[in-house]
Protein backbone atom coordinates (compact mmCIF):
# COMPACT_ATOMS: atom_id res chain seq x y z
CA UNK A 1 0.00 0.00 0.00
CA UNK A 2 1.01 3.64 -0.45
CA UNK A 3 2.28 5.28 2.77
CA UNK A 4 4.29 8.26 4.05
CA UNK A 5 7.18 7.13 6.22
CA UNK A 6 9.98 8.57 8.30
CA UNK A 7 12.41 6.45 6.36
CA UNK A 8 15.74 7.92 7.46
CA UNK A 9 17.03 9.78 10.55
CA UNK A 10 17.26 13.13 8.75
CA UNK A 11 15.01 15.93 7.52
CA UNK A 12 12.16 14.75 5.32
CA UNK A 13 9.22 12.39 4.84
CA UNK A 14 9.18 9.79 2.07
CA UNK A 15 6.49 8.04 0.02
CA UNK A 16 6.95 4.27 0.30
CA UNK A 17 5.27 1.01 -0.65
CA UNK A 18 4.45 -0.48 2.76
CA UNK A 19 2.82 -3.79 3.69
CA UNK A 20 -0.87 -3.64 4.57
CA UNK A 21 -1.16 -3.72 8.39
CA UNK A 22 -2.33 -6.93 10.07
CA UNK A 23 -5.35 -6.98 12.35
CA UNK A 24 -5.85 -8.47 15.79
CA UNK A 25 -9.08 -9.84 17.29
CA UNK A 26 -9.94 -6.47 18.90
CA UNK A 27 -8.96 -4.24 15.98
CA UNK A 28 -10.53 -2.40 13.08
CA UNK A 29 -9.02 -2.08 9.60
CA UNK A 30 -9.71 1.42 8.29
CA UNK A 31 -9.37 2.55 4.67
CA UNK A 32 -8.11 6.12 4.93
CA UNK A 33 -9.98 8.87 3.07
CA UNK A 34 -8.34 12.06 4.33
CA UNK A 35 -5.51 12.94 6.71
CA UNK A 36 -4.35 16.24 8.18
CA UNK A 37 -0.78 17.32 8.87
CA UNK A 38 -0.13 18.06 12.55
CA UNK A 39 2.55 20.21 14.12
CA UNK A 40 3.92 16.94 15.50
CA UNK A 41 4.33 15.66 11.93
CA UNK A 42 6.28 18.83 11.13
CA UNK A 43 8.59 18.16 14.11
CA UNK A 44 9.10 14.62 12.75
CA UNK A 45 9.75 16.00 9.25
CA UNK A 46 12.30 18.48 10.62
CA UNK A 47 13.93 15.73 12.71
CA UNK A 48 14.40 17.98 15.72
CA UNK A 49 15.74 16.92 19.11
CA UNK A 50 12.35 15.67 20.34
CA UNK A 51 11.91 13.54 17.20
CA UNK A 52 15.39 12.10 17.45
CA UNK A 53 14.69 11.00 21.01
CA UNK A 54 11.16 9.70 20.34
CA UNK A 55 10.51 8.43 16.81
CA UNK A 56 11.58 4.93 15.71
CA UNK A 57 12.91 4.82 12.14
CA UNK A 58 11.57 3.64 9.75
CA UNK A 59 7.90 4.22 10.67
CA UNK A 60 4.68 5.29 8.93
CA UNK A 61 3.67 8.63 10.49
CA UNK A 62 0.44 10.61 10.87
CA UNK A 63 -2.41 10.52 13.38
CA UNK A 64 -5.13 12.90 12.13
CA UNK A 65 -7.52 11.09 9.81
CA UNK A 66 -10.96 9.96 8.74
CA UNK A 67 -11.70 6.70 6.99
CA UNK A 68 -14.06 3.81 6.44
CA UNK A 69 -14.16 0.52 8.34
CA UNK A 70 -13.37 -2.30 5.86
CA UNK A 71 -12.66 -5.20 8.25
CA UNK A 72 -13.55 -6.00 11.85
CA UNK A 73 -11.76 -8.20 14.40
CA UNK A 74 -13.74 -11.21 15.60
CA UNK A 75 -14.04 -9.90 19.18
CA UNK A 76 -15.24 -6.43 18.13
CA UNK A 77 -18.83 -5.35 18.77
CA UNK A 78 -20.62 -2.13 17.87
CA UNK A 79 -19.02 -1.43 14.47
CA UNK A 80 -20.10 -2.36 10.95
CA UNK A 81 -18.36 -2.49 7.58
CA UNK A 82 -18.72 0.93 5.99
CA UNK A 83 -18.81 2.92 9.23
CA UNK A 84 -17.09 6.29 8.87
CA UNK A 85 -14.62 6.77 11.73
CA UNK A 86 -11.82 8.86 13.10
CA UNK A 87 -9.95 7.74 16.17
CA UNK A 88 -8.14 8.55 19.38
CA UNK A 89 -4.41 8.54 18.66
CA UNK A 90 -3.39 7.63 22.21
CA UNK A 91 -3.40 3.84 22.63
CA UNK A 92 -3.75 3.14 26.36
CA UNK A 93 -2.78 0.08 28.38
CA UNK A 94 -6.10 -0.64 30.09
CA UNK A 95 -4.51 -1.97 33.28
CA UNK A 96 -2.87 0.98 35.08
CA UNK A 97 -4.67 2.71 37.94
CA UNK A 98 -5.93 5.60 35.80
CA UNK A 99 -7.19 3.33 33.01
CA UNK A 100 -9.03 1.12 35.48
CA UNK A 101 -10.56 4.24 37.08
CA UNK A 102 -11.88 5.47 33.70
CA UNK A 103 -9.26 8.22 33.36
CA UNK A 104 -7.68 6.71 30.26
CA UNK A 105 -6.37 10.07 29.01
CA UNK A 106 -3.98 9.93 31.99
CA UNK A 107 -2.61 6.45 31.19
CA UNK A 108 1.06 6.32 32.12
CA UNK A 109 1.78 3.72 29.41
CA UNK A 110 0.33 5.56 26.39
CA UNK A 111 1.54 4.67 22.90
CA UNK A 112 0.97 7.17 20.08
CA UNK A 113 -0.34 6.37 16.61
CA UNK A 114 2.24 7.72 14.16
CA UNK A 115 4.62 8.46 17.03
CA UNK A 116 5.46 5.12 18.67
CA UNK A 117 3.63 2.82 16.24
CA UNK A 118 2.69 2.95 12.55
CA UNK A 119 0.34 5.79 11.77
CA UNK A 120 -2.44 6.99 9.51
CA UNK A 121 -0.51 8.45 6.55
CA UNK A 122 -1.26 5.29 4.59
CA UNK A 123 -4.03 3.71 2.55
CA UNK A 124 -4.93 1.49 5.52
CA UNK A 125 -4.66 1.82 9.30
CA UNK A 126 -5.24 -0.72 12.08
CA UNK A 127 -6.28 0.55 15.52
CA UNK A 128 -8.03 -1.03 18.51
CA UNK A 129 -11.80 -0.73 18.12
CA UNK A 130 -11.82 0.93 21.56
CA UNK A 131 -10.03 3.92 20.00
CA UNK A 132 -12.37 4.42 17.05
CA UNK A 133 -15.07 7.10 17.04
CA UNK A 134 -18.03 6.94 14.67
CA UNK A 135 -18.53 10.18 12.77
CA UNK A 136 -22.13 11.48 12.62
CA UNK A 137 -23.56 11.71 9.10
CA UNK A 138 -23.90 15.51 9.27
CA UNK A 139 -20.16 16.09 9.88
CA UNK A 140 -17.96 16.26 6.76
CA UNK A 141 -14.84 14.21 6.07
CA UNK A 142 -12.77 17.41 6.18
CA UNK A 143 -13.91 18.25 9.71
CA UNK A 144 -13.66 14.64 10.87
CA UNK A 145 -10.03 14.49 9.70
CA UNK A 146 -9.08 17.25 12.16
CA UNK A 147 -10.95 15.89 15.18
CA UNK A 148 -7.65 15.02 16.88
CA UNK A 149 -6.34 18.63 17.07
CA UNK A 150 -9.87 20.00 17.49
CA UNK A 151 -10.05 17.72 20.52
CA UNK A 152 -6.93 19.33 21.96
CA UNK A 153 -8.63 22.71 21.58
CA UNK A 154 -11.89 21.51 23.13
CA UNK A 155 -10.19 19.73 26.04
CA UNK A 156 -8.11 22.82 26.83
CA UNK A 157 -10.88 25.40 26.35
CA UNK A 158 -13.50 23.50 28.35
CA UNK A 159 -11.20 22.82 31.31
CA UNK A 160 -12.86 25.70 33.16
CA UNK A 161 -16.20 27.53 33.10
CA UNK A 162 -16.16 30.12 30.31
CA UNK A 163 -19.61 31.71 30.40
CA UNK A 164 -19.20 35.47 30.76
CA UNK A 165 -15.45 35.15 31.35
CA UNK A 166 -12.56 37.03 29.75
CA UNK A 167 -10.14 34.59 28.12
CA UNK A 168 -6.51 35.01 27.04
CA UNK A 169 -5.09 32.51 24.53
CA UNK A 170 -1.33 32.65 23.95
CA UNK A 171 -0.38 31.04 20.64
CA UNK A 172 -2.38 31.32 17.40
CA UNK A 173 -1.53 27.97 15.90
CA UNK A 174 -4.47 25.96 14.54
CA UNK A 175 -5.29 24.56 18.00
CA UNK A 176 -5.23 28.00 19.63
CA UNK A 177 -7.43 29.42 16.87
CA UNK A 178 -9.96 26.59 17.22
CA UNK A 179 -9.94 27.13 21.00
CA UNK A 180 -10.85 30.78 20.42
CA UNK A 181 -13.84 29.67 18.33
CA UNK A 182 -14.92 27.24 21.06
CA UNK A 183 -14.66 29.91 23.77
CA UNK A 184 -16.89 32.33 21.86
CA UNK A 185 -19.38 29.60 20.97
CA UNK A 186 -19.93 28.56 24.59
CA UNK A 187 -20.35 32.09 25.93
CA UNK A 188 -17.05 33.73 26.85
CA UNK A 189 -17.17 37.55 26.90
CA UNK A 190 -13.81 38.71 25.51
CA UNK A 191 -11.49 36.21 23.80
CA UNK A 192 -8.05 37.71 23.18
CA UNK A 193 -5.41 35.69 21.31
CA UNK A 194 -1.73 36.63 20.99
CA UNK A 195 1.03 35.67 18.55
CA UNK A 196 3.51 37.29 16.15
CA UNK A 197 2.25 35.53 12.98
CA UNK A 198 -0.02 37.97 11.12
CA UNK A 199 -1.50 35.30 8.84
CA UNK A 200 -2.72 33.21 11.73
CA UNK A 201 -3.86 36.22 13.76
CA UNK A 202 -6.09 37.24 10.84
CA UNK A 203 -7.45 33.69 10.74
CA UNK A 204 -8.15 33.83 14.49
CA UNK A 205 -10.07 37.08 14.03
CA UNK A 206 -12.21 35.45 11.31
CA UNK A 207 -12.98 32.55 13.66
CA UNK A 208 -14.33 34.66 16.48
CA UNK A 209 -11.52 36.14 18.56
CA UNK A 210 -12.52 39.51 20.05
CA UNK A 211 -8.99 40.76 19.43
CA UNK A 212 -6.04 39.09 17.75
CA UNK A 213 -2.93 40.81 19.10
CA UNK A 214 0.51 40.87 17.50
CA UNK A 215 2.60 41.29 20.64
CA UNK A 216 5.53 42.51 18.55
CA UNK A 217 3.44 45.57 17.64
CA UNK A 218 0.88 46.02 20.44
CA UNK A 219 0.96 45.96 24.23
CA UNK A 220 -1.48 43.46 25.69
CA UNK A 221 -2.33 45.77 28.60
CA UNK A 222 -3.34 48.50 26.13
CA UNK A 223 -5.71 46.04 24.47
CA UNK A 224 -7.20 45.17 27.86
CA UNK A 225 -7.85 48.87 28.51
CA UNK A 226 -9.43 49.24 25.07
CA UNK A 227 -11.85 46.41 25.95
CA UNK A 228 -12.72 47.96 29.31
CA UNK A 229 -10.99 45.21 31.29
CA UNK A 230 -9.89 46.59 34.65
CA UNK A 231 -8.96 43.48 36.62
CA UNK A 232 -7.39 40.87 34.33
CA UNK A 233 -8.25 37.68 32.49
CA UNK A 234 -10.35 35.04 34.22
CA UNK A 235 -9.13 32.10 32.13
CA UNK A 236 -5.81 31.59 30.34
CA UNK A 237 -5.13 28.99 27.64
CA UNK A 238 -1.40 28.62 26.98
CA UNK A 239 -0.95 27.10 23.52
CA UNK A 240 2.48 28.36 22.45
CA UNK A 241 5.16 26.79 24.64
CA UNK A 242 6.93 30.17 24.49
CA UNK A 243 8.21 31.31 27.92
CA UNK A 244 7.64 35.03 27.25
CA UNK A 245 4.01 34.31 26.33
CA UNK A 246 3.43 32.42 29.58
CA UNK A 247 5.09 35.19 31.58
CA UNK A 248 2.75 37.71 29.92
CA UNK A 249 -0.20 35.51 30.81
CA UNK A 250 0.79 35.39 34.49
CA UNK A 251 1.15 39.19 34.48
CA UNK A 252 -2.36 39.74 33.11
CA UNK A 253 -4.38 37.06 34.92
CA UNK A 254 -6.93 38.21 37.47
CA UNK A 255 -6.66 37.02 41.07
CA UNK A 256 -8.22 33.58 41.30
CA UNK A 257 -7.70 33.02 37.58
CA UNK A 258 -7.38 29.58 36.01
CA UNK A 259 -4.77 28.55 33.44
CA UNK A 260 -4.82 25.47 31.17
CA UNK A 261 -1.45 24.63 29.56
CA UNK A 262 -1.21 22.67 26.32
CA UNK A 263 1.90 24.29 24.81
CA UNK A 264 5.16 22.47 25.53
CA UNK A 265 8.22 24.63 26.31
CA UNK A 266 11.40 23.67 24.49
CA UNK A 267 13.28 23.16 27.76
CA UNK A 268 13.27 24.20 31.40
CA UNK A 269 11.16 27.32 31.93
CA UNK A 270 11.65 29.61 34.92
CA UNK A 271 8.59 31.52 36.12
CA UNK A 272 7.88 33.95 38.95
CA UNK A 273 6.02 31.64 41.31
CA UNK A 274 5.13 34.55 43.59
CA UNK A 275 2.60 35.65 40.94
CA UNK A 276 1.00 32.21 40.98
CA UNK A 277 0.90 32.14 44.78
CA UNK A 278 -0.23 35.68 45.56
CA UNK A 279 -2.82 35.70 42.76
CA UNK A 280 -4.14 32.30 43.85
CA UNK A 281 -3.88 30.94 40.30
CA UNK A 282 -4.84 27.40 39.33
CA UNK A 283 -2.65 25.83 36.62
CA UNK A 284 -3.74 22.62 34.87
CA UNK A 285 -1.67 20.60 32.41
CA UNK A 286 -3.51 19.31 29.33
CA UNK A 287 -2.49 16.25 27.32
CA UNK A 288 -4.55 14.93 24.43
CA UNK A 289 -8.28 14.49 24.78
CA UNK A 290 -10.50 12.99 27.49
CA UNK A 291 -11.63 9.57 26.30
CA UNK A 292 -14.21 9.86 25.10
CA UNK A 293 -16.00 12.80 26.68
CA UNK A 294 -14.03 15.27 24.57
CA UNK A 295 -14.96 13.39 21.38
CA UNK A 296 -18.70 13.58 22.14
CA UNK A 297 -18.35 17.28 22.93
CA UNK A 298 -16.52 17.89 19.63
CA UNK A 299 -19.33 16.36 17.61
CA UNK A 300 -21.99 18.17 19.64
CA UNK A 301 -20.28 21.55 19.29
CA UNK A 302 -20.23 21.23 15.50
CA UNK A 303 -23.81 19.95 15.41
CA UNK A 304 -24.90 22.93 17.54
CA UNK A 305 -23.53 25.40 15.01
CA UNK A 306 -19.82 25.87 15.74
CA UNK A 307 -18.06 26.45 12.40
CA UNK A 308 -14.37 25.53 12.42
CA UNK A 309 -14.14 25.03 8.65
CA UNK A 310 -12.11 28.25 8.05
CA UNK A 311 -9.16 26.65 9.88
CA UNK A 312 -8.77 24.29 6.89
CA UNK A 313 -6.86 26.39 4.37
CA UNK A 314 -5.13 23.92 2.03
CA UNK A 315 -6.02 20.65 0.28
CA UNK A 316 -3.58 18.42 -1.61
CA UNK A 317 -3.65 14.96 -3.16
CA UNK A 318 -1.42 12.61 -1.20
CA UNK A 319 1.06 12.50 -4.10
CA UNK A 320 1.51 16.24 -3.48
CA UNK A 321 2.39 15.68 0.18
CA UNK A 322 5.61 17.68 -0.13
CA UNK A 323 3.60 20.80 -0.98
CA UNK A 324 1.44 20.13 2.06
CA UNK A 325 4.42 19.91 4.38
CA UNK A 326 5.93 23.02 2.78
CA UNK A 327 2.69 24.92 3.49
CA UNK A 328 2.66 23.80 7.13
CA UNK A 329 6.34 24.60 7.63
CA UNK A 330 5.90 28.09 6.16
CA UNK A 331 3.55 29.18 8.94
CA UNK A 332 1.26 30.61 6.26
CA UNK A 333 -1.49 28.03 6.65
CA UNK A 334 -4.14 26.71 8.94
CA UNK A 335 -4.80 22.98 8.71
CA UNK A 336 -3.55 21.16 5.62
CA UNK A 337 -5.57 18.17 4.33
CA UNK A 338 -4.15 15.30 2.25
CA UNK A 339 -6.72 13.41 0.13
CA UNK A 340 -6.13 9.64 -0.19
CA UNK A 341 -9.11 8.70 -2.42
UniProtKB/Swiss-Prot annotation:
GO cellular component terms given for this protein: cytoplasm
EC number: 1.1.1.103
Annotated site location: Important for catalytic activity for the proton relay mechanism but does not participate directly in the coordination of zinc atom: 148
Intracellular or extracellular location(s): Cytoplasm
Pathway this chain belongs to: Amino-acid degradation; L-threonine degradation via oxydo-reductase pathway; glycine from L-threonine: step 1/2
UniProt keyword terms in alphabetical order: Cytoplasm, Metal-binding, NAD, Oxidoreductase, Zinc
Active site: residue positions: 40, 43
Enzymatic class: oxidoreductase
Main location: cytoplasm
Cofactor: binding comment: Binds 2 Zn(2+) ions per subunit.
Pfam families xref list: ADH_N (PF08240), ADH_zinc_N (PF00107)
Signal sequence, renumbered to the chain: none
Record-listed Zn(2+) 2 binding positions: 93, 96, 99, 107
Keyword Zinc: yes
Record-level GO BP terms: L-threonine catabolic process to glycine
Reaction(s) this enzyme catalyzes, per UniProt: L-threonine + NAD(+) = (2S)-2-amino-3-oxobutanoate + NADH + H(+)
Record's subunit section: Homotetramer.
Family per record: Belongs to the zinc-containing alcohol dehydrogenase family.
Name used for this protein in its record: L-threonine 3-dehydrogenase
UniProt source species: Shewanella woodyi (strain ATCC 51908 / MS32)
Amino acid sequence: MKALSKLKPEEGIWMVDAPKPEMGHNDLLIKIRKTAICGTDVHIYNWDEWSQNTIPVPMVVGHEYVGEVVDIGQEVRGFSIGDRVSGEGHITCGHCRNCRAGRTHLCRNTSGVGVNRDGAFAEYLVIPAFNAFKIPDDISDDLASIFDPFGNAVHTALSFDLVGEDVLITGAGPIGIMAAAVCRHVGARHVVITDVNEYRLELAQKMGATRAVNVAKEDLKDVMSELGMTEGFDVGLEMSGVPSAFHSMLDTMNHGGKVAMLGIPGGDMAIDWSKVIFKGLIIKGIYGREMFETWYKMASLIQSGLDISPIITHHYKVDEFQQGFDAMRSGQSGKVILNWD
